[in-house]
From Swiss-Prot:
It comes from Listeria welshimeri serovar 6b (strain ATCC 35897 / DSM 20650 / CCUG 15529 / CIP 8149 / NCTC 11857 / SLCC 5334 / V8). GO terms for molecular function: aminoacyl-tRNA deacylase activity; ATP binding; leucine-tRNA ligase activity. Its EC number is 6.1.1.4. The gene is leuS. Keywords: Aminoacyl-tRNA synthetase, ATP-binding, Cytoplasm, Ligase, Nucleotide-binding, Protein biosynthesis. This is Leucine--tRNA ligase. It catalyses: tRNA(Leu) + L-leucine + ATP = L-leucyl-tRNA(Leu) + AMP + diphosphate.
Length: 803
């Protein structure tokens, strides 16, 4: 006998919708719980089975917390700006707005079919002008506080996409989306000064409960380095340049210096003999992406400028080279090379026959760089010193001589914030003919994205908005002409603050009401994929800290607990993708097995953070378990089974209380697979009984409800209840019922285990000895032996010594 999910699931989804069951309560006498999913990008492909894994996890927590008497905020929305919709629109001639609306409608249908307890009244969409009004407002505040600025910088220009890409969007010299070639090109761009928050972004990781590997990824991305900035003079010139080094103690081993090919001094210092070689090399470098330039495995390339610098610590002349592995945007765009103790410098020196001088004892620098630690040699006043002492002594000397100083640098760069695309938030800025730049007045926000029929990139580096002359060209009251900013914001903008808008999504006066922000922040649990470990999470933390500084939000950090669900792979253990043809559509699973089965299966596959292959057999197993529950409690006629009674059953008492305790604990700690195992153990025990107390059945159904809510609601109704199960008080357990009154005793002969027995915990030594001697297996092993000694450890063992 099986239940009819096709009838049952729509019935309860309609009930929840009509009764507004999951509307967020804001009862001042209750604690608040904010469970957040990483909101989806509504693609044309719709949901795949990977999406519901994280959504089910937050839904289980949300449903449990409601039953535990908390106000629960569990919202959903759409991260709907961005390249894919625009690319689709360009390829098909469709309007990205219409395409996005269709996709959202499809995603909404799919998500509702899975029974998630979202508060749909709080739905947000980053492309809604009432939403992006506040994205623009945040940008204006950043600008007013000196954290948004324009700069001419070398950017990753992708001609095929017609836009600039952030470093994070370039993989192996190609665009992350589409795999198109990417080139370096100087362009005017909007930047956000995330570097101003580097230390706080680093230090405040200690305030949050996040996976350590995600914290480490952020720490590495920020890349705080302590060292010294050292000034080198250029021979026969008044020019100087600075290098940053974490090892100023190795200055005596600096035998050459290297500039980034874009360094401003190159033109001034290159000798006539080297000019042609330098120009040729610079042109070659323009075609390389940052990743190609810094690839450790590639052959080293470079060219000598003909100029020399003076090593400030020993007065030696050292040649100045240019090489692509030095990047202008990192450090100072120039390095001192210590080939004896750095692998990359060593390879470069080997390639071009440059001097290699060891300054640390250890290794054979004729064969390879020695990168370990050892006492200093060939270093005058540093000789014999260990690393830390030598670093301190070197910096002290540099500062005393006025040619260097202690410095902290970061790997983190400012955030490249503009995109040369149409489908994004307009940047609310006007450039006037007299050179002034002003913000669109706050009362005129949102600055609406104009309708456009032709949204192909201009190809010049300007966005398609540049073609909309009526929108771009403006005149102020005094007749001064200006042009609107034509770049748009990146997709990261809307997702950097969306969790704040859920708290008060209809507010027209502010991002959200201040009191409500105090009530709900920080987010209690945030679940999503690890692929957002650096970018989204770093950007959201940056904006949150800025909003904290200007008094908008009450907390330093946005997300208290973060959890990354694993990836659901195809049956062949490969990532699901359209090209591989192994994508599983949840619609088909819901149609065949039901939403509760999909939810149960995805939570039972393994630990939530593990990546596991999809398996149809596992789905069938999950459905069989749900059918087993149904058959135990419900008759063929659809009424409550007779074995569900109001009488007590001592045989189930311990199993029930153990289940309540364990399942509650496992749900709280996101160990849903082991929680489900406990539900299975109880059902197995219940099948062995002639009667099951109704109280236990109700408690079981409540524990089941966060995972299989439709089935649980149906069973709850059959149990005689007229209200939804969603707010019934969560079951409690009695610790005294869990106390073991029996214990397993090991029986030994001459220290070797011969038998095991279960006895009352209260038995004393004499009774245990008697039982041991009467045990059949012990009798067999003691036959013909004289008992010399009996050792009894109550609650553990009886050992009979004989010969």
């Amino acid at each position: 006998m099986t239940f009819n999910h096709k009838k049952m699931e729509p019935k309860w989804q309609q009930y929840w919708s009509e009764h507004n069951t999951f509307k967020t309560t804001e009862d001042k006498d209750k604690e608040n719980f904010y469970a957040l999913d990483m909101f989806p990008y509504p693609s044309g492909a719709g949901l795949h089975v990977g999406h519901p894994e994280g959504y089910t996890a937050t839904d289980i927590l949300s449903r449990m917390k409601r039953m535990q008497g908390k106000n629960v905020l569990h919202p959903i929305g759409w991260d709907a700006f961005g390249l894919p919709a625009e690319q689709y629109a360009i390829d098909t001639g469709n309007d990205p707005e219409e395409f996005t609306a269709l996709n959202i409608a499809n995603f909404t249908r799919q998500i509702k079919s899975l029974g998630f307890s979202y508060d749909w009244d709080r739905e947000i969409n980053t492309t809604d002008p009432e939403y992006y009004k506040w994205t623009q407002w945040i940008f204006e505040k950043l600008y007013e506080n000196g954290l948004a600025y324009e700069a001419e910088i070398a950017v990753n220009w992708c001609p095929a996409l017609g836009t600039v890409l952030a470093n994070e969007e370039v993989i192996d010299g190609k665009s992350e989306r589409g795999g198109f070639p990417v080139f370096r090109k100087p362009m005017r761009q909007w930047m956000l000064k995330i570097t101003a928050y580097a230390d706080r972004l680093l230090d405040d990781l200690d305030l949050v409960d996040w996976p350590e590997n995600i914290k480490d990824m952020q720490r590495n991305w920020i890349g705080r380095s302590e060292g010294a900035e050292v000034t080198f003079k250029i021979k026969d010139s008044d020019e100087t340049f600075n290098v940053f080094t974490t090892r100023p103690d190795t200055l005596f081993g600096a035998t050459y210096t290297v500039f980034a090919p874009e360094h401003e001094l190159i033109e001034k210092i290159t000798t006539p003999e080297q000019k042609e070689a330098v120009e040729t090399y610079k042109k070659q470098v323009e075609l390389k992406s940052e990743l190609e330039r810094t690839d450790l495995a590639k052959d080293k390339t470079g060219v000598f400028t003909g100029a020399y610098a003076i090593n400030p610590i020993n007065g030696e002349e050292v040649p100045i080279w240019i090489a692509d592995y030095v990047l202008i945007q990192y450090g100072t765009g120039a390095i001192m090379a210590v080939p004896a103790h750095d692998e990359r410098d060593f390879e470069f020196a080997q390639q071009f026959g440059l001097n290699i001088r060891p300054v640390l004892e250890g290794g054979d620098v004729t064969k390879e760089a020695f990168t370990g630690d050892g006492p200093h040699i060939n270093s005058e006043f540093l000789d014999g010193l260990a690393k830390e002492e030598a670093i301190t002594a070197a910096i002290d000397w540099l500062e005393k001589e006025g040619i260097g100083s202690r410095k902290i640098t970061y790997r983190l760069r400012d955030w490249l914030f503009s995109r040369q695309r149409y489908w994004g938030e307009p940047i609310p800025v006007i450039h006037w003919e007299d050179g002034e730049t002003t913000l669109v007045p706050e009362e005129e926000l949102p600055l609406l994205l104009p309708k456009a029929t032709e949204i192909k990139p201009s190809g010049t580096g300007e966005s398609p908005l540049a073609n909309l002359h009526d929108w771009v060209n403006v005149t102020d009251e005094s007749g001064r002409k200006g042009r609107r900013e034509t770049n748009t914001m990146p997709q990261w903008a809307g997702s950097s603050w969306y969790f704040l808008r859920y708290i008060d999504p209809k507010n027209t006066e502010a991002i959200a009401d201040k009191e409500k922000l105090i009530e709900w922040l920080p987010v209690d649990v945030y679940i999503g994929g690890a692929e957002h470990a650096v970018l989204h999470l770093l950007y959201a933390r940056f904006w949150h800290k800025f909003l904290y500084d200007i008094g908008v939000v009450p907390t330093k950090e946005p997300f208290q607990k973060l959890f990354n669900q694993g990836m659901i792979l195809g049956e062949n253990n490969e990532k699901m993708s359209k090209s591989r043809g192994n994508v599983v559509n949840p619609d088909e699973v819901v149609e065949k097995y039901g939403a509760d089965t999909l939810r149960m299966y995805e939570m039972f596959m393994g630990p939530l953070d593990a990546s596991i292959a999809w398996n149809e057999n596992g789905l069938e197993g999950a459905r069989k378990f749900l059918d087993r529950i149904w058959r135990l409690f419900v008759t063929e006629e659809g009424i409550l089974a007779e074995k569900v009674t109001t009488t007590a059953n001592a045989n189930l008492e311990k199993a029930y209380h153990h289940m309540v305790k364990t399942v509650t604990n496992h749900y709280e700690n996101l160990r849903f697979n082991t929680g489900i195992s406990q539900l299975m153990i109880f059902i197995n025990e219940a099948y062995k009984q002639d009667s099951i107390p109704k109280e236990y059945v109700e408690g079981f159904v409540q524990l089941l409800s966060p995972i299989a809510p439709h089935l649980a609601e149906e069973l709850w109704e059959i149990l005689g209840h007229t209200e939804t199960i969603s707010y019934v008080t969560w079951p409690t357990y009695d610790e005294t019922k869990l106390v073991e009154d029996e214990v397993e005793i090991v029986l030994q002969v001459n220290g070797k285990v011969k038998s095991k027995i279960t006895v009352a915990k209260s038995l004393g030594k004499e009774e245990l000895e008697k039982i041991a001697q009467e045990d059949d297996k012990m009798k067999e092993n003691l036959e013909g032996k004289t008992i010399r000694k009996v050792i009894v450890v109550p609650g553990k063992l009886v050992n009979i010594v004989g010969n």
